[in-house]
Design a protein with these regions (language model features):
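Zymogen propeptides
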Residues: 2-232
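Beta-strand-turn-beta hairpins that frame and shape the catalytic cleft
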Residues: 159, 171, 239-240, 302-309
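Extracytoplasmic
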Residues: 159-163, 197-198, 269, 295-297, ...
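Short, solvent-exposed aromatic-acidic interface loops
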Residues: 179-184, 248-250, 313-317
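A short, polar/proline- and glycine-enriched secondary-structure boundary/capping micro-motif
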Residues: 185-188, 251-258, 293, 319-326
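Conserved, well-ordered active-site substructure
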Residues: 214-235, 281-338, 343, 348-383
Length: 383
């Protein structure tokens, strides 16, 4: 039966607006008082841990107020909702399983692109309905008001490329998770397990920071290690990738000053940089990554604001030709990305969606690693 919506009277509309305004005043007052208390009274102990706890609590209050205001305004004013996540929360909201889907026929998916464009304001897609899928593979996707993710496989130069295109509504939906939830944890896990643990919509293996001592490692704005031997990919509070060439940040003080100045949330340290400002710039020598060998590759790319592409190249069965680094960079350039940064490939390079591995992994199985980065829904659990 179709629902009939009656137009509210002027008195009903006025009362609704008054109710919202009173609610907003109460929420904002309580949030202001809570922040004032934390800043002036602090947490017990006065330690650095206490200070960090205060910051985390203030972030939670900010997130609560923003989400409550969005809910209060819904249906009264024509105002776009804004949902965001707290960086200090280890687990993201659980995605709504009914919003996942799959198809073996890309030509049937124009409706999906249209819906994603309307919900998230996407003007340009990497995925299109004319894509030639790897034989026997499927397109997998997730769509809600805060995230669109679509994953597929193609064959290029007799090798398999797995791509996952992601558009999020808020920068906080792009996140990093360290095994054990803390820096330096002594155990490692496969990417699929960590992705499941944090409720990722889409996840990628990270830089495997515990395997080597290179690079600048940052989580939640704090520098843990600063070795400038490799290029670093920083993710700022706007969700943009900021790429820094090797040799520019060589100690913790330098790195922390850079992090503070640019509002950096976290980093990835592997490299090299492949594309910057839409121009290929991969080096011809690098300390890691088997540049000139045919090897499994992985990369994080940015298309435009809050719009990303994950890429993994593997060899499997009759499609066994893996790319050199330069061939990989050329393929990403063809995709039209503005920024591309190399991640740990080989047996490490994995893309996960809905807790399932999306790409064939070299040498038979996933490697246990120390970290992932991932994209999450910002809607409350279950959407």
């Amino acid at each position: 039966m179709e629902k009939i919506h009656k137009k509210p009277t002027a008195l009903q509309a006025a009362l609704a607006v008054l109710t919202v305004l009173v609610s907003l005043f109460a929420v904002c007052f309580l949030g202001f008082f809570a922040r004032w208390s934390l800043m002036n009274l602090g947490t017990p102990g006065g330690s650095a841990a206490g200070a960090e706890s205060s910051l985390a609590l203030m972030d939670k209050y900010d997130m609560y107020i923003t989400n409550e205001i969005s809910e209060a305004l819904d249906g009264v004013f024509s105002v776009e909702k804004v949902y965001w996540l707290n960086d200090y929360d280890l687990v993201a909201p659980e995605p709504d399983q009914s919003r996942f889907g799959s198809s073996s026929d890309p030509t049937e998916l124009q409706w999906l692109l249209d819906d994603a464009a309307q919900l998230l304001g996407i003007e340009k897609f990497i995925f299109h309905t004319g894509i030639q899928l790897r034989p026997g593979s499927e397109v997998n996707w997730y769509l809600d008001e805060t995230i669109f993710a679509i994953t597929w496989q193609e064959v290029k130069n007799y090798g398999v490329y797995t791509f996952s295109e992601v558009r999020i509504a808020h920068p906080s939906q792009m996140r990093r998770f360290l095994a054990g939830g803390t820096y330096g944890y002594d155990k490692q896990f496969v990417t699929t397990q960590m992705a499941c643990d944090v409720n990722a919509v889409v996840a990628s293996s990270g830089d495997f920071y515990k395997f080597r001592n290179y690079g600048v490692v940052v989580t939640n704005g704090q520098v843990h290690r600063a070795n400038g031997a490799v290029d670093t990919c920083f993710i700022d509070d706007q969700g943009d990738l900021i790429l820094v060439k090797r040799g520019q940040l060589n100690n913790v003080e330098q790195a922390q000053a850079f992090v503070d100045e640019h509002n950096i949330r976290f980093s990835l340290a592997f490299g090299p940089i492949l594309i910057q400002d839409g121009v290929r710039c991969e080096p011809y020598d690098y300390i890691i990554g088997e540049i000139d060998e045919n090897y499994p590759r992985a990369a994080l790319c940015q298309v435009d604001s809050l719009h990303y592409l994950l890429a993994v190249a593997n060899g499997v069965s009759e499609y066994s030709n893996m790319p050199t680094l330069h061939q990989f960079a050329a393929r990403l350039e063809e995709m039209g990305v503005q920024t591309a940064y190399t991640l740990d490939g080989g047996q490490t390079g994995v893309i996960v969606m809905n807790d399932r591995m999306m790409n064939p992994v070299q040498y038979g199985s996933q490697r246990q690693i120390s970290d992932i980065f991932y994209f999450a829904t910002a809607l409350p659990d279950g959407g």
